Amino acid sequence: MRRVAVYMGTRNYYGMMEIAAKSLLRHTRVDRVWFLIEDDKFPEEICGPQGLPDVIRCKNMSGQTWFTQDGPNYNAHWTYTCLLPVAYPEIFPEEKRVLRLDDDTIVEKDIGELFDMDLEDNYTAMVEEPVRGKFPFRYFNAGVTLMDLEKFRQTGIHRKMIRMVNSMVCTAMDQDAFNVYCQGQIKKIGPEWNMAEHITEHHNDPYIRHYAGCLKPRGERAFREYEQAEWRVKE
């Protein structure tokens, strides 16, 4: 099974995206990392003249047609790129599965086990978080999501998810759509795979640390420290 990771973001997230991806590459063997961005290539002022590691490829999503600019979530607090994961089955038609990782995640150990995990006929594997009031069912955080793209394409459920985010306000963007349409077919994984203190059970030895929501200021400091550390991956 190919190990494919995907990060997405607008230009203001490029710096975090590069650091997040290099934390993954430092610990884990992968076959491909995709950056879904707003440019044809990653800016040299961020990655330096040496460019990105060879395993990383960029897709320019500025001309995407899945999400309408007059839709209720396109210009929300988060950028339209946060809607892209519901279209991954079509963005990556050649892939059987991908691991979606938010730009504000740092991989701290080898996550090969997550890449190779048996999804047991579920659409995704995700970490559960406390139920939000508007949802009368188990709610999962999408910041780390292993997706069975073949299953999505077979059922076409992602098309309903795309229609949902184009037609109604989703405060958590694609995350709401995953929880509505994949409910009952989400494999629950432990908090060590997506450790964000305000949304998941605390774990002292996480594989992936997620600086989400209220942890953003601390996350920005952590990313700067990571970038400056002697063991940061260099090409």
Where are these regions (language model features)?
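Short internal beta-strands
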Residues: 33-38, 126
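Short Gly/Pro-enriched turn/cap motifs at secondary-structure boundaries
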Residues: 77-78, 134-137, 167-170
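Short, polar loop motifs at secondary-structure junctions
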Residues: 37-42, 111, 130-131, 193-195
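Residues at the starts of beta-strands that form the adenosine-phosphate
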Residues: 32-33, 97
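GT-A fold catalytic core of metal-dependent nucleotide-sugar glycosyltransferases
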Residues: 81-139, 146-147
